[in-house]
Swiss-Prot record:
Provenance organism: Caulobacter vibrioides (strain NA1000 / CB15N) (Caulobacter crescentus)
Reactions mediated catalytically: tRNA(Phe) + L-phenylalanine + ATP = L-phenylalanyl-tRNA(Phe) + AMP + diphosphate + H(+)
SUPFAM superfamilies according to UniProt: Class II aaRS and biotin synthetases, tRNA-binding arm
Localisation per UniProt entry: Cytoplasm
Protein name in UniProt: Phenylalanine--tRNA ligase alpha subunit
Cofactor info, note text: Binds 2 magnesium ions per tetramer.
Subunit record text: Tetramer of two alpha and two beta subunits.
Pfam families cross-referenced by the UniProt entry: Phe_tRNA-synt_N, tRNA-synt_2d
Length: 357
C-alpha cells in the first residue's frame, strides 16, 4: 500500500510548484484524473477486507479532497496573477489627450432645405418630388413657354442628344415640372412644395450650374394674390426668425404666371453684410404669381372654376442670406475648412416648435 503521507507531500509540492494553469492542470490529471495516482488507490479498495476498506477509504478520500482544495486555491491564485499581469501591461494614462476624430457636418444647403420644408409642412403643404431628367412638355410646353423662348436654347439649358424621333430630354431648369405632374395626377384642392436640384448653364458668385430650389403651388377655388402675399410673408418671418420682415412686390414676367411678381425684402447692406429686417435697401428674394390659365388648361384643370398661385426660391441663396456665406461657389468647393465652419450638427434637425437653427 502506497504511503499516503508521502503521496500527499509529493502531490502538494507539485501543486505549489505549478507556474501556470497548464502545469497545474497536468498535476490535477496525474493525481485525481481517471488514471491518476489517487484515483488508482480508490480502485484498490475492492480487494480489501471490510474493516481495512473502511479505514483506507476514509483516508484516501480525505487525501483526494485535500489535493482538490489545494488545486482550486492554486488555480485562483494563478488566474489572479495572470489578470494582474494583463492589467499592468494594458495600463492607460488617463492624463493623455484623447485621439482627434474628425466630425462630419450637415451641408448648409441641406440644412436650409430642411428648414424650408419644415416651415411649409407646418403650414399644411405636402412635399412632392419628380425626376431630374425631364421632357420638353413638362419643363416648357405645359408651363406656357413659347416655342422660341430663350430658355429653350442650348446656352441656358442642358440638353441630351436627340432621340431617334427627334425628342430631346433635358436636365430640368426648375422644379416646376413637379407642379405639372401633380396637377395632372391629382384633383384640386392642391397645396404642395417641390424641393430639389435644378440645372442651368450659369456659373458666377451667385449662380452655379447645379442649384437647389423649392417651389410652391396652391390650387383651389377663390385663390387670389392676398393668399400668396400672406403665405410668403409668413414663411419669411419664420425662416429669418424675425417679425420685422418688410416686403414689396414688383411686377415681373414669367410665362407660367399672370400676374407675375418678384418679391423683395428690406435689408441693410452696410458693413459688407446683408441683414434682413433692417436698413433701407431692398433685395430680390423670390419669384411668384397667379398660375396662368394656359397652365391650368394644359394640366386638365378648368381655370374658370379653379385658381392658384405659385412661387419659387433658390435654397442655396436663402442659406447665403441667412448664414452670411459670401460666394455661392464655395458651397461646392469640397473645402473641409469651409464645411467645418458653415456646417451644422447632425443633431440640429430643424423644428419650428423648438427653433430652426
Amino acid at each position: 500500500m502506497t504511503d499516503l503521507n508521502t503521496l500527499e507531500a509529493d502531490v502538494l509540492a507539485q501543486v505549489a510548484a505549478a507556474s501556470d494553469l497548464q502545469a497545474l492542470d497536468a498535476v490535477r490529471v496525474a493525481a485525481v484524473g481517471k488514471t491518476g495516482s489517487i484515483s488508482g488507490l480508490l480502485k484498490t479498495l475492492g480487494a480489501m477486507s471490510p474493516e481495512e476498506r473502511k479505514t483506507q477509504g476514509a483516508a484516501i478520500n480525505a487525501l483526494r479532497d485535500k489535493v482538490q482544495d489545494a488545486i482550486t486555491q492554486k488555480k485562483a491564485a494563478l488566474e489572479a496573477a495572470e489578470l494582474d499581469a494583463r492589467l499592468a501591461s494594458e495600463t492607460l494614462d488617463l492624463s493623455l489627450p484623447a485621439p482627434y476624430r474628425r466630425k462630419g457636418s450637415v451641408h448648409p444647403t441641406m440644412q436650409t432645405m430642411d428648414e424650408v420644408v419644415a416651415i411649409f409642412a407646418e403650414m399644411g403643404f405636402a412635399v412632392a418630388e419628380g425626376p431630374d431628367i425631364e421632357d420638353d412638355f413638362h419643363n416648357f410646353t405645359a408651363l406656357n413657354f413659347p416655342e422660341k423662348h430663350p430658355a429653350r436654347e442650348m446656352h441656358d439649358t442642358f440638353f441630351f442628344n436627340p432621340k431617334e424621333d427627334g425628342e430631346r430630354m433635358l436636365l430640368r431648369t426648375h422644379t416646376s415640372p413637379v407642379q405639372v405632374r401633380t396637377m395632372v395626377s391629382q384633383k384640386p384642392p392642391i397645396r404642395i412644395i417641390a424641393p430639389g436640384r435644378t440645372y442651368r448653364c450659369d456659373n458666377d458668385a451667385t449662380h452655379t450650374p447645379v442649384f437647389h430650389q423649392v417651389e410652391g403651388l396652391v390650387i383651389d377655388k377663390g385663390i387670389h394674390m392676398g393668399h400668396l402675399k400672406w403665405t410668403l410673408e409668413t414663411f419669411l418671418a419664420r425662416f429669418f426668425e424675425t417679425d420685422a420682415v418688410t416686403t414689396q412686390f414688383r411686377p415681373h414676367h414669367f410665362p407660367f404666371t399672370e400676374p407675375s411678381a418678384e418679391m423683395d425684402v428690406q435689408c441693410d447692406r452696410s458693413g459688407g453684410e446683408i441683414k434682413i429686417g433692417q436698413g433701407t435697401s431692398w433685395l430680390e428674394i423670390l419669384g411668384c404669381g397667379m398660375v396662368h390659365p394656359n397652365v391650368l388648361r394644359a394640366c386638365g384643370i378648368d381655370p374658370d372654376e379653379y385658381q392658384g398661385f405659385a412661387f419659387g426660391m433658390g435654397v442655396d441663396r436663402l442659406g447665403m442670406l441667412k448664414y452670411g456665406m459670401p460666394d455661392l461657389r464655395d458651397m461646392w468647393s469640397s473645402d473641409v475648412r469651409w464645411l467645418s465652419h458653415y456646417g451644422f450638427s447632425a443633431f440640429a434637425a430643424p423644428n419650428p416648435a423648438s427653433g430652426l437653427s
